[in-house]
Design a protein with these regions (language model features):
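Bacterial N-terminal signal peptides that target proteins for export
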Residues: 1-7
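Flexible, solvent-exposed loop/hinge segments and secondary-structure transition points
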Residues: 23-658
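Short, conserved catalytic or interaction motifs in soluble domains
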Residues: 20
Length: 658
């Protein structure tokens, strides 16, 4: 590397707080997969992880961990979350504690110390695979940067991260995510045991320019995140993962540190090949370490004690393939089951005579996908490529009416788009308050299976009604809540970003809030997450395919007051709007996969354009929208669209006056 290149890398490190630096591995060879110029179509050629790929990743990671005196648990997954292997080194910590750095936080998942190491490693691997595409390579360190109370973290005058709340998606209780059937890898997207991870140590894996999976590593006793990105960490989890990814590492031009959001460069990894203590190209074989340095694990609900090959993303076996029926000319992709039967073709709503028809649902999804294909992506490279998103439409009962995806959209957006749609529909309905008042409380753990306290969900209803100055809020359906508006109310500071401001009514106060204790969003699904941990520990049955209405461990996880409208949980960052026929709520649309302003625009304009085309439905009337409210003297936001969003047009302010 030239002196000029080194100088530029250092300057970028200081100015952008990105990982920068050399990407060389021990031995001086760049470990990044050569850039194939992939923009979303490379996966058309079936590409997947082989058994040898998985074994090599584990063997390389084990060698690096040994050199560091660390004992790690390592997981490898394919792009749709099939767990291909989990390997635990001798002496590895088997129980992990959830804990944020700094001042102790009281409640939520903070301090829970019974999380199996295997689940932490799997969650890290899934996160890296699900956040990455041919246009971007994100890691769990990237996730850490974009889910905290400020973006960038510790910048006390900046709003929360753009994907604030995404950590509680892909949940093990989701009715959308598929489950391990006990055999070979199959159709996904598969659930993640802890949602998405913000703990460094999860990296995506690439072959021939396309994402084929992820590797996750846990070698300490803490499942955490990085709250200070002004420095460069020497993190064993991350460096062991870097070694594991060698030979399958992300192309340099697609890495997070090549991508800026709101003028801030994202982080990829604080470690590179030059920081390794071993040369992965000469690591011992897997056969020589298996049952010597450690063992393959069987993880209930995820994998047997074996090594498997992954599925080829974008082809039927992966559960995601090109559409052949409903969206001609739109380069659409759909979800299918293990028999290649489409899971979510457009159907009519279930909520009575005013319900959306199948034709209307198809039109909404088609218009939204058309908009995404026209729009300039924020988080993909090269510049000028289209936004790639997942789009979900639900009715007012939360029933899935249709899901469609753009080419190479990130996998995480499937579950998140559904969460967003359901959240907008639920909080805009007449039954939200009663439903929240009727679910069991979140039973917080004090470390292990000891009750810290119980948190009733009704507290959030009371807080919202008081905060908004509307005694009938969440009961009369008078206000249309988008996810951007609901997100405003879910931040630990209101208005967002100013440390010391009061918390929103759906959030937690200081001392109780953290990314592992977000408020209503977590409390609604808390008991389900604990039950699933108990299942993996052979202490409870597995969680049902609904994340709500589950009581605490002290009541044997009994179910009561299940909220069908929120079966996969809620989401609290932008990208959804409710849908109306006149003033009658008939459902909602959720969009996820690119920048949040792009997600907002695709949802809002998708409904608008479909309604203009067919007539009879559309966005909420302006007097109903949440941006008519000014709680605490600060106006809520409804949607926020990019100023000049389209690739081949200079049209501006495309959402204005609609």
């Amino acid at each position: 590397m030239s002196l000029r290149a080194v100088s530029l890398a250092c300057i970028m490190l200081v100015l952008a707080a990105c990982s920068g630096g050399s990407q060389k591995k021990a031995g001086g060879v760049d470990p990044a997969t050569p850039d194939q110029g992939c923009e979303g179509s490379c996966a058309d050629t079936p590409t997947s992880l082989t058994v040898t790929d998985v074994e090599n990743a584990i063997a390389q990671a084990v060698a690096e961990a040994q050199a560091r005196g660390a004992s790690a648990t390592i997981a490898v997954v394919d792009r749709v979350g099939n767990v291909l292997a989990v390997f635990r080194m001798s002496g590895a910590t088997t129980s992990i504690t959830v804990s944020s750095p700094g001042t102790a936080v009281d409640g939520g998942l903070e301090g829970v110390n019974i999380v199996p190491d295997s689940l932490a490693a799997i969650a890290k691997a899934v996160t890296a695979a699900y956040l990455s595409t041919e246009g971007n390579a994100f890691t769990t360190r990237t996730a850490s940067q974009i889910v905290q109370d400020h973006f960038n973290p510790l910048d006390s005058l900046q709003p929360a991260g753009p994907l604030f709340g995404v950590q509680f998606s892909q949940l093990p209780c989701s009715d959308l995510m598929t489950r391990f059937a006990g055999g070979a890898p199959d159709a996904g997207p598969h659930r993640s045991p802890l949602g998405l991870s913000a703990d460094p140590g999860g990296l995506p894996l690439f072959k021939a320019g396309t994402v084929v999976g992820g590797v996750g590593v846990i070698s300490d006793a803490t499942y955490s995140l990085d709250v200070d990105i002004s420095n460069v960490d020497a993190d064993d989890d991350e460096l062991v993962a870097v070694a594991g990814a060698s030979g399958l590492a992300a192309p340099d031009l697609r890495r997070a540190n090549r991508i800026a959001v709101d003028g801030r460069t994202l982080r990829f990894s604080d470690g590179s090949g030059n920081d390794l203590m071993t040369d992965p190209t000469v690591a011992p074989t897997f056969a020589s370490i298996n049952n010597v340095a450690g063992v393959l694990l069987a993880v209930p609900g995820y994998v047997t004690a074996s090594v498997s090959a992954g599925t080829a993303f974008g082809h039927a076996a992966s559960g995601i393939r090109p559409d052949t029926l409903d969206y001609p000319g739109l380069d659409a992709f759909v979800l299918v089951d293990s028999l290649n039967v489409e899971r979510f073709r457009p159907i009519a709503g279930t909520d009575g005579a005013m319900a959306l028809t199948a034709i209307e649902v198809q039109a909404i999804l088609g218009e939204a996908l058309t908009l995404a294909n026209m729009s300039r992506a924020q988080i993909r490279r090269p510049f000028g490529t289209p936004a790639r998103v997942s789009i979900s439409v639900v009715d007012s009962n939360g029933v899935i009416l249709g899901i469609v995806r753009g080419r190479d959209a990130p996998v995480f957006g499937i579950d998140v788009s559904l969460q967003k749609a359901r959240t907008a529909s639920f909080f805009s309905s007449t039954g939200a308050a009663a439903a929240l008042n009727g679910v069991p409380p979140a039973t917080y753990l004090n470390g292990g299976l000891v009750v810290l306290r119980k948190e009733p969900l009704s507290q959030y209803v009371t807080a919202a009604q008081s905060f908004l100055g509307l005694p009938n809020a969440l009961t009369d359906g008078a206000i249309a809540f988008s996810d951007r508006a609901g997100g405003n109310l879910s931040r630990p500071f209101y208005p967002d970003g100013v440390t010391g401001n009061p918390n929103g009514p759906f959030s937690k106060p200081p001392g109780q809030w953290s990314p592992f204790s977000t408020g209503l969003q977590l409390d609604l699904v808390y008991n389900a997450i604990v039950q699933h941990i108990g299942f993996v520990l052979a202490a409870a049955p597995d969680v049902p395919t609904n994340c709500t209405g589950i009581d605490g461990f002290d009541n044997a996880f009994a179910t009561a007051g299940v909220i069908g409208q929120l079966a996969n949980g809620t989401q609290i960052f932008p990208g959804s709007v409710p849908i109306y026929r006149g003033n009658q709520l008939v459902g909602a649309i959720g969009v996820s996969g690119d920048g949040v302003d792009q997600d907002d625009m695709v949802a809002f304009l998708g409904v608008h354009r479909a309604g203009q085309s067919l007539g009879g439905f559309g966005n909420a009337a302006k007097p109903m929208r949440a941006d008519t409210l000014t709680p605490q003297g600060v106006r809520l936001r409804y949607v926020n669209c990019p100023i000049t969003p389209f690739i081949d047009s200079d049209e501006q302010n495309v959402c204005e006056s609609k």
